Amino acid sequence: MKSVYNFVVTPVKSRYNNTKDIGGKELIVNTEIFNHQYVSREAIVKAIPTVGDTDIKVGDKVIVHHNVFRRWHNQHGIEKNSRSYIDEETYLVQPDQIFLYKDTEWQAQKGYCFVAPVKSTDKLSVDKEKPLVGIVKHTDGTVNKGDLIGFRPSSEYEFII
């Protein structure tokens, strides 16, 4: 299967990452489909768009938007798949829904930068991290890896990579 403008991907393990292995037994930590924190974001590229230029190749691992694999309830309470859904193993992903890709090393897509938090040294603060600063871990080339940067409020979104 190929798409003209979209990537074709498959989830790495499953649509949701809501289980943990504890003592050899599987524990389900969340049963809600609407909680974005438990939606899988890792995928493997099955096909690239036929139109456009991309550094992403078939077989690369990618980090996608949480709504790609997510299920939701419509206004009538009926459970639906995302618009990316083709079948349980196949999803169409728009280029702007891919944030990172990995052949051998993680690379950020154009327009994205991934920042690790800086631990707070302020003994009077209850915050574990310094607000609005971080160290660049994955970059699109606009800033250097390892740089200490500042960013605007509400421009951050947590990813665990």
What is each model feature region?
Residues 1-161:
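Acidic-enriched and Gly/Ser
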